[in-house]
Amino acid sequence: MLTIADTTFSSHLIMGTGGATSHEALERALVASGTELTTVAMRRHAGTRGGESIFDLLRRLDIAPLPNTAGCRTAREAVLTARMAREALGTTWVKVEVIADEHTLLPDVVETLDATELLAAEGFTVLAYTSDDPVAAQRLEDAGAAAVMPLGAPIGTGLGILNPHNLELICSRASVPVLVDAGIGTASDAALAMELGCSGVLLASAVNRCQNPEAMATAMRHAVEAGRLARSAGRIPEREHAQASSTFEGLASWADQVL
C-alpha cells in the first residue's frame, strides 16, 4: 500500500496524462496500469472528446485526479494554479512543479520551496517535484510537503535514473513518501526506482509516447511491483570476488572410480 497524507492507494504507480495521443489510448493505458492517481496539468485543462473531458474520464474510471502546476515559473503562479484547481475540482491535492526554464525543464528548487510552504500552510496536500538533491528534498519535507518527487532524469528524456546514489539517500532520510518523477524510459527504470527505496513512481511520457501505450503501462505496473518486492526481499550484498552457491565438499574424484 502507498499512503500519502491520510489517503492509501493499493497501486504504487502514478500516471500522467501528458503526451497521450487520444482519449482512447489514454483510457486503455490507465486501465492497464492499475493506477488510482493521475496527474493533469491545469493550464491545459486537457481538452474534450465528444463532450468528455479528461476529468470526466478519470471520474468514470474511478481514478483520483492530481492537479499539476506544470509550466509555472514562479511560486506565485504555482499557488494561484493550485487555488484554481481547488475551486474547479474540489480537491486540496496538488503536484507542485515550478520549472527554471523551458529548455531543461529542471525544477526551480527555491520557487518550489516557497510554493510548498505557502500551500501547505493553506491546508493543501503538496506533492513537490524537485531535483535529486537530498538537501532540497529534506527542505521540502520540512516545509510541509506530503511527498517529495525527485527526478530520475530531465522530463521527457527517458534517460532513467541518472543518480541512483542520491535517490537512495533521499529515500533513506525521508519520513514522507518519495516518488520518483520524470526521466523514466522503460520498465527496468521503474523497477530500479522501487529497488532503491522509492515509495512509488510517477510517469507519463514513457507510456503515452511509446509505440504501444497499453502494453507499456502493463509492463510498468508489473515492474513497479517487482521492484517493490525485490526491495522488501532484501537483495544479496554486492561482492568483489566470486562466491560459489554450492560447496566443493563431496565432489567426485578419480579415487572414487573403479578402474
Curated annotation (Swiss-Prot):
- Enzyme's top EC category: transferase
- Molecular function as annotated in GO: thiazole synthase activity
Q: Which GO terms describe its cellular component?
A: cytoplasm
Task: Give the EC number(s) under which this enzyme is classified.
Answer: 2.8.1.10
Q: Which UniProt keywords apply?
A: Cytoplasm, Schiff base, Thiamine biosynthesis, Transferase
Pfam families the UniProt entry points to: ThiG (PF05690)
Q: Where does 1-deoxy-D-xylulose 5-phosphate bind?
A: G156, A182, G183, A204, S205
Pathway the protein acts in: Cofactor biosynthesis; thiamine diphosphate biosynthesis
**Which reaction equation describes what this protein catalyses?**
[ThiS sulfur-carrier protein]-C-terminal-Gly-aminoethanethioate + 2-iminoacetate + 1-deoxy-D-xylulose 5-phosphate = [ThiS sulfur-carrier protein]-C-terminal Gly-Gly + 2-[(2R,5Z)-2-carboxy-4-methylthiazol-5(2H)-ylidene]ethyl phosphate + 2 H2O + H(+)
Tell me where on the tree of life, at the top rank, the source sits.
Bacteria
UniProt-listed SUPFAM superfamilies:
ThiG-like
Q: Where in the cell is it found?
A: Cytoplasm
Gene Ontology terms describing biological process: thiamine diphosphate biosynthetic process
- Catalytic site: K95
Task: Please give the chief subcellular localization of this protein.
Answer: cytoplasm
State the HAMAP family in the record.
ThiG
**What is the role of this chain?**
Catalyzes the rearrangement of 1-deoxy-D-xylulose 5-phosphate (DXP) to produce the thiazole phosphate moiety of thiamine. Sulfur is provided by the thiocarboxylate moiety of the carrier protein ThiS. In vitro, sulfur can be provided by H(2)S.
Q: How does it assemble?
A: Homotetramer. Forms heterodimers with either ThiH or ThiS.
Q: Which family does it belong to?
A: Belongs to the ThiG family.
The name on file for this protein is: Thiazole synthase
Source species, please? Corynebacterium aurimucosum (strain ATCC 700975 / DSM 44827 / CIP 107346 / CN-1) (Corynebacterium nigricans)
Its lineage opens with: Bacteria, Bacillati, Actinomycetota, Actinomycetes, Mycobacteriales
Q: Which gene encodes it?
A: thiG
